[in-house]
Regions:
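C-terminal ends of transmembrane alpha-helices
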Residues: 44-51, 106-120, 170-181
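Membrane-proximal helix-loop-helix units in multi-pass membrane proteins
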Residues: 80-149
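Membrane-interfacial loop-to-transmembrane alpha-helix junctions, especially the N-terminal start
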Residues: 25-37, 155-162
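Membrane-interface helix caps and helix-loop-helix hairpins in membrane proteins
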Residues: 52-57, 124-125, 181-185
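Internal transmembrane alpha-helix with an interfacial aromatic "cap," most often the third helix
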Residues: 14-27, 44-97, 111-117, 206-210
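Hydrophobic alpha-helical transmembrane segments of multi-pass membrane proteins
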Residues: 32-50, 63-66, 166-174
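C-terminal transmembrane-bundle signature of multipass membrane proteins
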Residues: 144-148, 158-215
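Hydrophobic transmembrane alpha-helical segments in integral membrane proteins
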Residues: 1-13
Length: 215
């Protein structure tokens, strides 16, 4: 059951990324908030290359697949992100690119430090710590997706399918925490509960916006 849910989570997130890429190219906009994308890339880079999962070949394959798909999503941000900048007389396209790279670098440094520091919560198991960190960034991501939808006032770059696959992708592996198949701490369980709230809220808002033709 544990392996099945982990593979299911990996597969649903792969589908989510592919759908984001498709919708971004179709609508000519980016479909993932910059800070969320930076954290994603940093997590995938760190736990694929710096702290790779020992003996878990399927996990390595999934992490690398996520990483390369996120690079494509980063491309869509570079391609379409600047047109969403409101004060173009203050922020140039070049400065936006530089700012983006800096955020990604800082995010990678954070992940490297956090992987080591948070491992003490899980008997120095960095692999388990990576799951805790993933839930923290998933909460940030879930909030940012809701914020992006509300700020844009439309579903460009977003879809109900993205919202649902994203939610199930996170829920699949988090079931392991609630059923004690994987170790967890109380704070993490609270974070997971918050993720479910914001993911379901995002699905509801996407449905409402789509139904009212706010595209």
């Amino acid at each position: 059951m544990e392996l099945f849910l982990q593979i299911l989570s990996g597969a649903f997130w792969i589908i989510t990324y592919i759908l984001i890429i498709y919708k971004s190219l179709k609508d000519k906009t980016y479909g993932m908030p910059l800070f969320a994308l930076s954290l994603n890339l940093a997590w995938e880079f760190t736990f694929s290359f710096i702290y790779p999962p020992d003996g878990l070949v399927f996990a390595k394959i999934i992490f690398l697949t996520w990483f390369f798909l996120d690079l494509i999503i980063l491309y869509t941000f570079f391609k379409y992100g600047y047109k969403n900048v409101k004060c173009k007389n203050i922020i140039s396209k070049k400065s936006l690119y530089i700012f983006t790279i800096i955020i990604i670098i800082f995010s990678i440094v954070f992940m490297i430090l956090a992987g080591n520091d948070f491992s003490v919560l899980f008997e120095n198991d960095i692999t388990q710590a990576s799951g805790f960190i993933a839930n923290i960034q998933n909460l940030i991501m879930s909030i940012l997706f809701v914020s992006m939808l509300l700020n844009r006032g439309n579903t460009l770059g977003q879809s109900i399918a993205i919202a649902i696959f994203k939610w199930i992708g996170t829920l699949s592996v988090d079931i392991l925490k609630f059923t004690n198949m994987l170790p967890s701490i109380t704070t993490e369980l609270f974070i997971i509960a918050l993720i479910q709230f914001f993911d379901i809220l995002y699905i509801y808002l996407i449905y409402i916006y789509s139904k009212r033709k706010c595209v």
